[in-house]
């Protein structure tokens, strides 16, 4: 019995009872006299004990029948759910490449030609032994969702394994990039995403995440949205199909540039949306030809343009949240939830990818809210730890005045005035960054800066000069500590220690990327003593030398849990003052 039928039956019984109660009330009123009255709901005055007992039995019988009907309805729903799960398990076991219905695989596309589109079948590597060795050598963990009985797919360790699984144009574009082998995060995410499944990728910035979700995004467009490429608009704003959200303008620009290397040769329009520049110009670019299918942007600007009607997110079926932990740290969770609510739902076939450097409870909660049984891929550890390929040097200085002299000594020791080696220098505040930049420039060094006081165009220009080694020194605040993938940074200098140990780990992670080694130099003073214990732990975990002077500071670590930062979070907000009162003598 369906829910609507059950409700109708209950309503009919209620009407019948109401009529009988009115008749009984009339008889009771006649017997008791004019003083008898009924309640507002039409309940009768007390009748004879025999009639009352008979009525109570009937009421109990009707209630029991209604409960039985409801239980039967619940049993029917449970049986239907079991049949659906059994059907899904059989299809997975059969490993059929045929297209399935929307109920079983929401984003399955009409079966395309075998030569030009991805197969929906489970991926099997040509050399399983090599794939397992790849997983072990790179310390990779691949976990299938708990509710699934399927084994997680092994990685694609060779680009040739993409043949026949992606469109020929997508494969040709990838081949033109000149890569020799996939990175660990790419090798593990491609088999999952090309099967139209959700994925959570835990890996450090600079590990190749953009191509990990970028290549499947292009394949998704070629198969699922090929019919939409006529460019005819059905909504007020520009309708897009792939949306990538990043926490900062710099990371969004960088991600769009990397995706453009793959997509623009295929004629797929894409745009980067971020604040600090003209919104009118971005609206104009959104409506250009070829029509924009991919948007990469920051949460604030994307939500702003979606709300004012410039951007239509109702057609988004491929969603990527990049640096998810960083976005939650910056307080973007409400914006992210609002944006996801404007996209297609999971039931309508939206696929979601989430990438993060760590896996704190807040990120897990976001994944549980919006993802559909994701496969979790972890490269390395999901705990915050320093890159072992970075040689960490910590110098304990008497005071802050010694930093400037020591920085000059270091730069001259590595011949920074003539060398093209890239050195990234971190300051804590923008005023401090400006002062360091000016001092170095007066000393004859080629240096650029990136901090909050610079306009967007100035920041982009500084980054480009640093990337090209035109100015091999870059002084930055923590705005550049996460997300930016600047290749071939040889040295990182922490002129001032950051506010948290997490920021320290992310700062030194700017070097030693892509399998290369790097070096970091950190100046530590009495002002930073609260971080001594945490810094010693990070150094020991990475098998680095701990200077004797550092161990002289208090090393107690208050282990607290924070929704975004995880353990070892130092609460900087002072507690509420306590009022002390004394008893009168």
Curated annotation (Swiss-Prot):
Pfam families, sorted: DEAD, Helicase_C
Enzyme Commission code: 3.6.4.13
GO cellular component: nucleolus; preribosome, large subunit precursor
Gene3D superfamilies from the UniProt entry: P-loop containing nucleotide triphosphate hydrolases
GO molecular function: ATP binding; ATP hydrolysis activity; mRNA binding; RNA helicase activity
Residues involved in ATP binding: 203-210
Residue ranges, compositional bias (Low complexity): 26-43, 94-124
Motif Q motif: chain residues: 159-187
Keywords (A to Z) from UniProt: ATP-binding, Helicase, Hydrolase, Nucleotide-binding, Nucleus, Ribosome biogenesis, RNA-binding, rRNA processing
Catalysis performed (reactions): ATP + H2O = ADP + phosphate + H(+)
UniProt biased composition (Basic residues): 52-64, 79-93
A GO biological process held by the record: rRNA processing
PANTHER family according to UniProt: ATP-DEPENDENT RNA HELICASE DBP3
Family assignment from sequence similarity: Belongs to the DEAD box helicase family. DDX5/DBP2 subfamily.
Protein name as catalogued: ATP-dependent RNA helicase DBP3
